[in-house]
Amino acid sequence: MLVVHAAWVLVVAVVISLAYEIWRATSKAGTSRHDSLRFLMGGLVTYVIAAAVIASLFIGPAWAAWVGLLFCVVWIVYGIFVFNPVVMLERQPGIIDWVEDLVFMGLLFVAATLLLYEVLGWELQR
């Protein structure tokens, strides 16, 4: 059950992230080199991979929790060490940018925690 919850958390995170990137590519085009349809198209591979990971979490093979956890950790590390110090700062972020970043990263941490509980065999108690 934790895997399904993690999958839904990732669905929300990916939808928020994709909507944000579309907004940046259209309404903020030219603000930085990262605010363009070209940058958006280059990042679509990540969203396709995310969709495949989410689908595997919903389908439920035994390895899906491990793959989902690895995916979350990689995305978190990228966010902390590349996206925030490079991309965000070049974008001249406003309140929407920071809120999206905090919500997105928070959701990744929630999904990673749920998946870690799953791979360790832990359960949440009511």
Q: Model-found features: residue ranges?
A:
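Short juxtamembrane and helix-loop transition motifs at transmembrane-helix boundaries
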Residues: 2-5, 22-37, 92
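Membrane-helix boundary connector in multi-pass membrane proteins
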Residues: 80-100, 120-123
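Individual transmembrane alpha-helices with interfacial aromatic-anchor signatures
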Residues: 44, 93-110
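Core segments of alpha-helical transmembrane spans in multipass integral membrane proteins
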Residues: 16, 36-58, 70-77
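Cytosolic juxtamembrane helix and N-cap/initiation of the first transmembrane helix
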Residues: 1-18, 107-110, 114-126
